[in-house]
């Protein structure tokens, strides 16, 4: 691509994805692996992980609604943050005052362990060199040490904002243009925990969530989302994974989830967020697993499985 703005460049991109869902009556498990090079994907390991989770979900029990301490695995955290980010860290949403950031930029609203960026240049993700308007990509700090720092912009939203505002290279694919600029490369800094087991020990008494689905935005200005857990939800007792749980309905304010974070894993995972329903645009969230002091369960669903 060559633009009148002086940018000239080219990009060749690939992505490889292995998704595994192991399910039978009353049991299910899920795992995935995403990379830009097929050599970095191990379908056999993905399948084994899904099967192991499924084996542990049989005979799932119910859980009373309430506020629980929780560990969210990277698949769960990736999906939760991607939904939150599209409304929160969009420059257009900020201009239209429908973003959680509205009136809060520069304030510490999250735990100081939480730092989030939009970074399409990170080779651990699915790198992109420029956006759909031909603007070069860049790393955009969104949250630093719990402080809300900024949003992403495309050419129209930056022009509307005026002043010295410039596009950050976040124009989305044509099918998504109505939403304005979007952060397609969410990256959360890892923490100090060496394993998920260490996070489970920190939580001590709560729940573990592998994956989410059917997410919906309830109140974007407050960052409230609702959805269901699936394919591997467990009770945490005495710092260990205990009995499996049925699928749970949750309604959370994401800022509450991120406000008190006992820990995050050092290792991050590329959680696949590619759309397979219309125009496909491969992207993902580079995230650790996280321990949170608040995850609000508001109801129960059916058991795992088919």
Residue ranges of model-derived segments:
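N-terminal small-residue-enriched
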Residues: 1-306
